[in-house]
Structures are given as structure tokens and as C-alpha cells.
């Protein structure tokens, strides 16, 4: 069965203090607002919608409720004990049941889809189905199928998609790995996509393989020399470390950030020949945030 995974749906950046996370991403030019609470899960989040995907900043709202729902491991608390950062990449499906069945036929250990939800500050219940990988495939990706239409979800937040930094969509997400060739084979099996060619990433200074998911790309990257990928691995080990956003104006994004106290982002030239700029993790809750687009 052909994969019906459609795109990167969102990234999950986890923070110890949600208000501080909102403030940080507001300084970067995102219109980000409290998204509500995950009922019975002890967590809450803030959301910045783009055209069809979004940014989620999440924190623990009630420690005891979280531990009761997550079990004794308390994975999010363990993650946050090493600092804020990008924890999961969430991939969207149009038919999660079919994708789960297809993954299992490929030998992937994955859960049955389960229903989840979030109550917005206005009391509106948003719903989705989610599937997670098992311990034989401990990758930092989750799978989602939204049950609430995009227009209804966007309507819950003011100025949805109208960001001062001009961001229109997620372009690419980067995951640091110790062995890019081995990781590319594993992600190929999980995603149901061919193994991509390995290339040297000019900005992240890593050997990388890019999986195209609709208009978005999921990249596994092995550090090759000092740079963002190597720094991220030295700081907290392998895992997601960077999000690249496509903006309508690089200069407009830079001006907003300068006006809000963010130092000028480093600039570089991507493999595509495009100019990109990169905000370091100390200004983005432990995550590299990149921008690419016209001046």
C-alpha cells in the first residue's frame, strides 16, 4: 500500500516555562498564542499556525498529573532536565490506519492509532488520532491524523499565519544522527520512502539525507565538521535540533528580530544556492531556527 503521509504537520519544542517560550518565539517574529491544555495529560502548549502546518511550544502544567499519565519514566521531565529543545517531529497522515498497517508490513513496530485532544482557552475541543513508534524503532517522530479540520483549528487563534517574520510554512526539519547511512535506511523503512542520496549540508556542516514529505523535508544529518549539527550533538546528543522556515522576506524577519533584541542571525548559502539565516539555540529555546526566502 502506498504511503499516505502527506507532510510535516508540526514540530514540538519543549520548555520548562511556557510563558518564556512564548516570549522567545514572539521575539523571533511568530504570532504565537496559548493553545490550551491536554486534558488528563498534565501539559499545556502554545501554537503558531503557518499556512498548513504549525509550531508547538509545550510544557508541563501539572507535574503530578503528567507523571500519572506518562508513567514513572516521565519522558518529558527527563528531556527537560537537559534543557529546553526540539523533542519531536510530527508527520501528518490522511489515513493513519492505512499508514500504520503499511508500516507493520514493512516490519516497523508502531502502535494502533489512539484518539487525543486539546481544550483551547475558549473551551473548544480539538481532536486527532496519533500513532507512536515502538522500542524497536526509537525515532523522534510521531504520526498524526487530524479529526478537526484545519480551518476550525486555525480559527481558534488570532492572526493565524500572519507572522511579522513572514513565515509561510515549514521547509525542513533536521535530526542529528551518529551514522547517516544507517539512519537513512531506518527512516526509509519507517516512512515508506526510497533511501535518499547523501550530500554535504553547507550550512549545518553535516552529511545529510533528505526525505521529501509533500512540500516539507525531513533530514537526518551526521556532523562532519564544527557547525550547528556538531554543536547540537555535543550539547544534548542525537535528535532533532533545527527547523528551517520559508519566509516571504528575509530582511523583514531580520528587522523584526533586531527591533526585539535578537542579535543578527548568522547567514550562509544552502546547497540550493539560496541565502539562509540561522538563529542560535540560546535565543530559540534550545533549537536552531532557520529562515530561507527572498530578501
Task: Tell what function each PLM region has.
Residues 46-48:
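Short beta-strand scaffold segments in enzyme catalytic cores
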Residues 1-8, 13-32, 50-197, 203-295:
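Glyoxalase I/VOC metalloenzyme domain signal
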